[in-house]
Protein backbone atom coordinates (compact mmCIF):
# COMPACT_ATOMS: atom_id res chain seq x y z
CA UNK A 1 0.00 0.00 0.00
CA UNK A 2 2.81 2.47 0.78
CA UNK A 3 4.12 2.14 -2.78
CA UNK A 4 1.03 4.10 -3.85
CA UNK A 5 2.38 7.05 -1.87
CA UNK A 6 5.55 7.41 -3.94
CA UNK A 7 9.26 6.87 -3.49
CA UNK A 8 10.24 8.47 -0.18
CA UNK A 9 13.97 8.10 -0.98
CA UNK A 10 13.71 10.79 -3.67
CA UNK A 11 12.24 13.49 -1.47
CA UNK A 12 14.08 16.80 -1.75
CA UNK A 13 12.79 18.28 1.47
CA UNK A 14 14.37 17.63 4.83
CA UNK A 15 12.48 15.16 6.98
CA UNK A 16 12.26 16.24 10.61
CA UNK A 17 12.36 13.67 13.38
CA UNK A 18 9.78 14.17 16.15
CA UNK A 19 10.34 12.12 19.31
CA UNK A 20 7.28 11.70 21.56
CA UNK A 21 8.88 9.20 23.95
CA UNK A 22 8.85 11.61 26.90
CA UNK A 23 5.15 12.31 26.52
CA UNK A 24 3.37 9.55 24.62
CA UNK A 25 5.91 6.81 25.23
CA UNK A 26 5.70 7.09 29.01
CA UNK A 27 2.01 6.23 28.89
CA UNK A 28 2.97 2.60 28.27
CA UNK A 29 2.90 0.43 31.40
CA UNK A 30 6.36 0.25 32.98
CA UNK A 31 7.82 3.01 30.79
CA UNK A 32 7.69 5.87 33.29
CA UNK A 33 10.97 7.71 33.92
CA UNK A 34 12.28 9.78 36.81
CA UNK A 35 12.89 13.52 36.56
CA UNK A 36 16.60 12.94 35.90
CA UNK A 37 15.90 10.17 33.39
CA UNK A 38 13.66 12.56 31.42
CA UNK A 39 16.44 15.15 31.23
CA UNK A 40 19.04 12.52 30.31
CA UNK A 41 16.81 11.12 27.57
CA UNK A 42 16.15 14.61 26.14
CA UNK A 43 19.89 15.34 26.02
CA UNK A 44 20.57 12.00 24.29
CA UNK A 45 17.81 12.67 21.74
CA UNK A 46 19.24 16.11 21.01
CA UNK A 47 22.78 14.70 20.72
CA UNK A 48 21.74 12.17 18.06
CA UNK A 49 20.02 14.84 15.99
CA UNK A 50 16.33 14.59 16.87
CA UNK A 51 14.70 17.77 15.53
CA UNK A 52 11.69 18.03 17.86
CA UNK A 53 11.25 16.58 21.35
CA UNK A 54 7.72 16.53 22.72
CA UNK A 55 8.73 16.89 26.36
CA UNK A 56 5.43 16.47 28.18
CA UNK A 57 2.04 17.80 29.22
CA UNK A 58 2.81 20.69 31.64
CA UNK A 59 -0.77 21.06 32.89
CA UNK A 60 -0.84 17.43 34.08
CA UNK A 61 1.21 18.00 37.24
CA UNK A 62 3.85 20.23 38.85
CA UNK A 63 6.45 17.52 38.17
CA UNK A 64 5.51 17.38 34.47
CA UNK A 65 5.66 21.19 34.28
CA UNK A 66 9.13 21.19 35.87
CA UNK A 67 10.37 18.46 33.52
CA UNK A 68 9.23 20.37 30.41
CA UNK A 69 10.72 23.61 31.75
CA UNK A 70 14.08 21.99 32.55
CA UNK A 71 14.26 20.28 29.15
CA UNK A 72 13.45 23.57 27.37
CA UNK A 73 16.04 25.46 29.44
CA UNK A 74 18.76 22.84 28.87
CA UNK A 75 18.13 22.36 25.15
CA UNK A 76 20.39 23.90 22.55
CA UNK A 77 19.41 25.87 19.47
CA UNK A 78 19.37 22.80 17.21
CA UNK A 79 16.32 21.14 18.76
CA UNK A 80 12.74 22.33 19.17
CA UNK A 81 10.92 21.52 22.39
CA UNK A 82 7.18 20.88 22.24
CA UNK A 83 4.65 20.75 25.06
CA UNK A 84 1.17 19.23 24.74
CA UNK A 85 -2.19 20.63 25.84
CA UNK A 86 -5.85 20.34 25.12
CA UNK A 87 -7.47 23.31 23.38
CA UNK A 88 -7.92 25.07 26.72
CA UNK A 89 -6.41 28.44 27.53
CA UNK A 90 -5.15 27.44 31.00
CA UNK A 91 -3.40 24.36 29.60
CA UNK A 92 -1.87 26.34 26.73
CA UNK A 93 -0.74 28.92 29.30
CA UNK A 94 0.97 26.13 31.28
CA UNK A 95 2.82 25.11 28.10
CA UNK A 96 3.83 28.72 27.45
CA UNK A 97 5.11 29.17 31.01
CA UNK A 98 7.11 25.93 30.85
CA UNK A 99 8.65 26.76 27.47
CA UNK A 100 9.10 30.55 27.54
CA UNK A 101 12.62 30.67 28.97
CA UNK A 102 13.88 27.90 26.69
CA UNK A 103 16.77 28.41 24.31
CA UNK A 104 15.56 27.15 20.95
CA UNK A 105 12.35 26.85 19.01
CA UNK A 106 9.29 26.34 21.21
CA UNK A 107 6.12 24.55 20.12
CA UNK A 108 2.73 24.41 21.79
CA UNK A 109 1.05 21.26 20.50
CA UNK A 110 -2.65 21.45 21.21
CA UNK A 111 -5.43 19.08 20.28
CA UNK A 112 -9.19 18.94 20.03
CA UNK A 113 -11.43 15.89 19.45
CA UNK A 114 -13.26 15.64 16.13
CA UNK A 115 -14.68 12.13 16.14
CA UNK A 116 -18.29 11.98 17.36
CA UNK A 117 -17.47 9.68 20.29
CA UNK A 118 -14.55 11.81 21.49
CA UNK A 119 -16.52 15.06 21.13
CA UNK A 120 -19.37 13.60 23.15
CA UNK A 121 -17.00 12.42 25.90
CA UNK A 122 -15.00 15.65 25.95
CA UNK A 123 -17.45 18.54 25.66
CA UNK A 124 -20.85 17.08 24.95
CA UNK A 125 -22.93 17.25 21.82
CA UNK A 126 -24.21 20.60 20.61
CA UNK A 127 -21.36 22.63 22.16
CA UNK A 128 -18.97 22.78 19.22
CA UNK A 129 -20.16 25.87 17.36
CA UNK A 130 -17.78 28.28 19.12
CA UNK A 131 -14.68 26.09 18.76
CA UNK A 132 -13.36 27.50 15.42
CA UNK A 133 -13.44 31.04 16.88
CA UNK A 134 -11.70 29.72 20.01
CA UNK A 135 -8.99 28.24 17.76
CA UNK A 136 -8.45 31.64 16.11
CA UNK A 137 -8.39 33.46 19.44
CA UNK A 138 -6.02 31.12 21.29
CA UNK A 139 -3.71 30.51 18.36
CA UNK A 140 -3.55 34.26 17.76
CA UNK A 141 -2.60 34.83 21.39
CA UNK A 142 0.12 32.19 21.59
CA UNK A 143 1.54 32.24 18.04
CA UNK A 144 3.42 35.47 18.75
CA UNK A 145 5.98 33.63 20.90
CA UNK A 146 5.50 29.98 19.98
CA UNK A 147 5.02 27.77 16.96
CA UNK A 148 1.63 26.08 17.08
CA UNK A 149 0.98 22.46 16.21
CA UNK A 150 -2.68 21.39 16.08
CA UNK A 151 -4.02 17.85 16.16
CA UNK A 152 -7.59 16.90 15.34
CA UNK A 153 -7.92 14.02 17.80
CA UNK A 154 -9.69 11.02 16.31
CA UNK A 155 -9.64 12.50 12.81
CA UNK A 156 -9.82 9.11 11.09
CA UNK A 157 -13.14 8.44 12.80
CA UNK A 158 -14.64 11.81 11.89
CA UNK A 159 -16.75 12.31 8.79
CA UNK A 160 -14.51 13.68 6.05
CA UNK A 161 -17.24 16.02 4.76
CA UNK A 162 -18.06 17.16 8.28
CA UNK A 163 -18.43 20.95 8.16
CA UNK A 164 -17.16 21.24 11.75
CA UNK A 165 -13.86 19.57 10.81
CA UNK A 166 -13.57 21.81 7.74
CA UNK A 167 -14.24 24.89 9.89
CA UNK A 168 -11.55 23.79 12.37
CA UNK A 169 -9.02 23.19 9.61
CA UNK A 170 -9.85 26.55 8.04
CA UNK A 171 -9.44 28.31 11.41
CA UNK A 172 -6.06 26.62 11.95
CA UNK A 173 -4.80 27.52 8.47
CA UNK A 174 -5.99 31.12 8.86
CA UNK A 175 -4.13 31.26 12.18
CA UNK A 176 -0.84 30.30 10.48
CA UNK A 177 -0.49 27.05 12.40
CA UNK A 178 2.92 25.49 11.69
CA UNK A 179 1.77 21.84 11.70
CA UNK A 180 -1.67 20.25 11.43
CA UNK A 181 -1.96 16.58 12.45
CA UNK A 182 -4.83 14.37 11.31
CA UNK A 183 -4.23 11.33 13.53
CA UNK A 184 -5.76 7.90 13.80
CA UNK A 185 -5.77 8.46 17.56
CA UNK A 186 -7.07 5.13 18.84
CA UNK A 187 -6.15 3.02 15.83
CA UNK A 188 -8.10 0.77 13.56
CA UNK A 189 -8.90 3.29 10.84
CA UNK A 190 -5.54 3.95 9.22
CA UNK A 191 -5.61 4.98 5.59
CA UNK A 192 -2.85 6.15 3.27
CA UNK A 193 -3.06 7.62 -0.18
CA UNK A 194 -6.38 6.08 -1.16
CA UNK A 195 -6.16 2.95 0.96
CA UNK A 196 -9.12 1.82 3.00
Predicted regions and their residues:
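Intrinsically disordered, low-complexity segments enriched in glycine/proline and serine/threonine
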Residues: 7, 29-30, 57
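Conserved oxyanion/phosphate-binding beta-strand-loop segments in alpha/beta enzyme cores
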Residues: 2-13
Amino acid sequence: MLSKCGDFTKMKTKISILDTTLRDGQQSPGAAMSYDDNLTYAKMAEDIGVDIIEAGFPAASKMEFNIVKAIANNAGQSVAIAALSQLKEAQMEACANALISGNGRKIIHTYFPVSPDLIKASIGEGKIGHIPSLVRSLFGKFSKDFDIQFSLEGFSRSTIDNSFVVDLLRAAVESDVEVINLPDTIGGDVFCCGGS
